[in-house]
Curated annotation (Swiss-Prot):
Cofactor(s) in the UniProt record: [4Fe-4S] cluster
NCBIfam families (alphabetical): 30S ribosomal protein S12 methylthiotransferase RimO, MiaB/RimO family radical SAM methylthiotransferase
MTTase N-terminal domain mapped to chain residues: 3-118
Domain Radical SAM core: 143-370
Function: Catalyzes the methylthiolation of an aspartic acid residue of ribosomal protein uS12.
Gene: rimO
GO MF annotation, one: protein methylthiotransferase activity
Catalytic activity: L-aspartate(89)-[ribosomal protein uS12]-hydrogen + (sulfur carrier)-SH + AH2 + 2 S-adenosyl-L-methionine = 3-methylsulfanyl-L-aspartate(89)-[ribosomal protein uS12]-hydrogen + (sulfur carrier)-H + 5'-deoxyadenosine + L-methionine + A + S-adenosyl-L-homocysteine + 2 H(+)
One term under GO cellular component: cytosol
Protein name according to UniProt: Ribosomal protein uS12 methylthiotransferase RimO
Keyword Lyase: no
Protein keywords: 4Fe-4S, Cytoplasm, Iron, Iron-sulfur, Metal-binding, S-adenosyl-L-methionine, Transferase
Family: Belongs to the methylthiotransferase family. RimO subfamily.
Occurrences of domain TRAM (ranges): 373-437
Length: 437
C-alpha cells in the first residue's frame, strides 16, 4: 500500500520553494501526493515565524492539524522556521507532532521520513515508476496546475537588520550553485510553468559580486522555453541599480520591481541597521520606470519601530505621494525575541501602530484609485492563472503571483498558462475586471 503525503505551506514564496523541494524528495523515496490533508498518511506543515502574527497562525494551523490527525490516524510532521526556532516547545507542548525538523533539510524529507519510520522501508512503499518519472520533471512549485514556479537562488542573510529574526534560524547567506538554479528552472518549465520567480532572503547578494549576479539572471533568461522571469526581494542598493538596467535590456524580465524599503526616515533606517535614504530610494524607483516602460513597483514598510515619531510617518506619506508605488505592503512592528530591536524600548503602542498603518493605507488607496482610473481601457500583457467561481483569473505581467492584483475575465475557455492581452474595464479596491483581447 503506497503512503501519501500532503504539505501545508505557510508564509512567503520562499517557503513554497522549500515545500516543493520536500515534495520532490518525498516522491523520490516512493511516497505519493494526496489531494487533501485528511487523505494523507503524513501531513507536513511548513511553518513561518517571521512576525508574531505568522507565529500565531503557525501554532493554530498545527493545533487544527492535530485534530485532523486524531480522526484519520495520520502522522503530523512540522518543519521549517518554527521548528528551527522552537524545537523544545514543540517537543514539550505539542505531543501530537510525530516528527519535526528545521530549515536546511527540505531536500532530505523523504529520507528523514524513512529513517524515522523504518517500518516503511522499503517494502511498505510502492515505487510507481511512471508517477516518479513524471514528477521528476517538476521543480519547486506549490501547485503544478499553476503556470508559475518559485526557484530559490539562496538561503539565509548577512544583512543583520535589527528587526529580523531570520538569520538566527536560516543562517548566513548561502547561495545555490548556478547549475542547480538552471536545473530547477528547467524542471519547472517542463512541468508546465511559463513564469519563473527567483526568490531568496536577499536576491541581490547572490555571488557577492554584481557581475556574478547579472550572469546568473542572464543565463536563466536565456532558457528558450521560459516566457516570463520575475525577480523578487531586491534590497535597495547599487546592485539593484544594475539589475534594473538589465531589466531594461531583457524583454523576458517582467516589468516589476519588488524592493522592500521598510522605512524612509534616515533616523529609523539607522536604528534598523539598514542602508539608504529617501532621496536614493526615489532615484532608484525613477530609474526603474525610466529603463522599463510600464514597470510597476511593490515595496513594504514596517510601522511602529522603536523611536518612530509622527514626523517619521509623515516622511513615508510624502514618499508615497512623490513616488506613487502601485503596491504597498504595511507591517506593524512586533519585537522578535533574539533581535536587537527587541532590546530597544518599545515606544509605540499597538493602538498607535494601527492608527499609523490606517493613515498610510488610506493615503495610498487614494493614489491607487487614481492609478486604477488610468488603467481603464488600457491593454496589458497577461497570463491566465486559472478559473475561479466561473471566471478566468488573469494576471498582468506587472503583478506577481499570489500577492498582487488580478484581473477577472468572463471567459472560462481560457486555459491556465495562456499568454495574451487583457483590457482593463473596471476595478475594485485592488483587483480589476477586464476583457481578453
Amino acid at each position: 500500500m503506497d503512503k501519501k503525503f500532503y504539505i501545508t505551506t505557510l508564509g512567503c514564496p520562499k517557503n513554497i520553494a522549500d515545500s516543493m523541494s520536500m515534495h520532490h524528495s518525498l516522491l523520490e523515496e516512493g511516497f505519493t501526493p494526496a489531494s487533501l490533508p485528511e487523505e494523507s498518511d503524513f501531513h507536513f506543515i511548513n511553518t513561518c515565524t517571521f512576525i508574531q502574527s505568522a507565529t500565531e497562525e503557525t501554532i493554530q494551523t498545527i493545533l487544527s492539524a492535530a485534530q485532523v490527525k486524531k480522526q484519520n490516524h495520520q502522522k503530523l510532521v512540522v518543519v521549517g522556521c518554527f521548528a528551527e526556532r522552537y524545537p523544545d516547545n514543540i517537543h514539550s507542548e505539542i505531543p501530537e507532532v510525530d516528527l519535526f525538523f528545521g530549515t536546511g533539510k527540505y531536500s532530505q524529507a523523504g529520507k528523514i521520513l524513512r529513517e524515522k519510520f523504518p517500518e516503511l522501508s522499503p517494502s511498505q512503499l510502492e515505487f510507481n515508476d511512471s508517477l516518479l518519472e513524471r514528477w521528476k520533471l517538476s521543480s519547486k512549485i506549490e501547485n503544478y496546475s499553476k503556470p508559475y514556479a518559485y526557484v530559490k537562488v539562496s538561503d539565509g542573510c548577512n544583512r543583520g537588520c535589527s528587526f529580523c529574526i531570520i538569520p538566527s534560524f536560516r543562517g548566513k547567506f548561502a547561495e545555490s550553485p548556478l547549475d542547480d538554479i538552471l536545473r530547477d528552472t528547467n524542471r519547472a518549465i517542463r512541468a508546465g510553468a511559463k513564469e519563473i520567480c527567483l526568490v531568496s532572503q536577499d536576491t541581490v547578494y547572490y555571488g557577492r559580486d554584481s557581475e556574478i549576479l547579472l550572469d546568473m539572471v542572464r543565463k536563466v533568461a536565456e532558457i528558450d522555453s521560459l516566457e516570463i522571469l520575475r525577480l523578487l526581494y531586491l534590497y535597495p542598493d547599487k546592485k539593484t541599480e544594475k539589475l534594473i538596467r538589465l531589466m531594461g535590456e531583457t524583454s523576458k524580465i517582467a516589468p516589476y520591481l519588488e524592493s522592500p524599503l521598510q522605512h524612509v526616515s534616515s533616523k529609523i533606517l539607522k536604528v534598523m541597521n539598514r542602508t539608504g535614504e529617501s532621496s536614493y530610494f526615489k532615484d532608484l524607483f525613477s530609474l526603474a520606470r525610466e529603463v522599463k516602460p510600464g514597470l510597476e513597483i511593490r515595496t513594504s514598510f514596517i510601522i511602529g519601530y522603536p523611536g518612530e515619531e509622527p514626523e517619521d510617518v509623515d516622511q513615508i506619506l510624502r514618499f508615497i505621494e512623490d513616488t506613487r508605488p502601485e503596491k504597498v505592503n504595511l507591517f506593524s512592528y512586533s519585537p522578535q525575541e533574539g533581535t536587537k530591536g527587541a532590546q530597544l524600548k518599545q515606544t509605540v503602542s499597538e493602538k498607535e501602530k494601527s492608527k499609523r498603518i490606517n493613515l498610510i493605507r488610506d493615503s495610498h488607496l487614494e493614489i491607487l484609485e487614481e492609478i486604477h482610473e488610468s488603467r481603464i481601457g488600457r491593454t496589458y500583457d497577461a497570463i491566465v492563472d486559472g478559473i475561479e467561481d466561473g471566471q478566468a483569473v488573469v494576471r498582468r505581467f506587472q503583478d506577481a503571483p499570489e500577492m498582487d492584483e488580478v484581473v477577472y475575465v468572463d471567459d472560462v475557455s481560457l486555459l491556465p498558462g495562456r499568454i495574451g492581452k487583457v483590457r482593463i474595464d473596471s476595478f475594485y479596491e485592488y483587483d480589476m475586471n477586464g476583457t481578453w483581447v
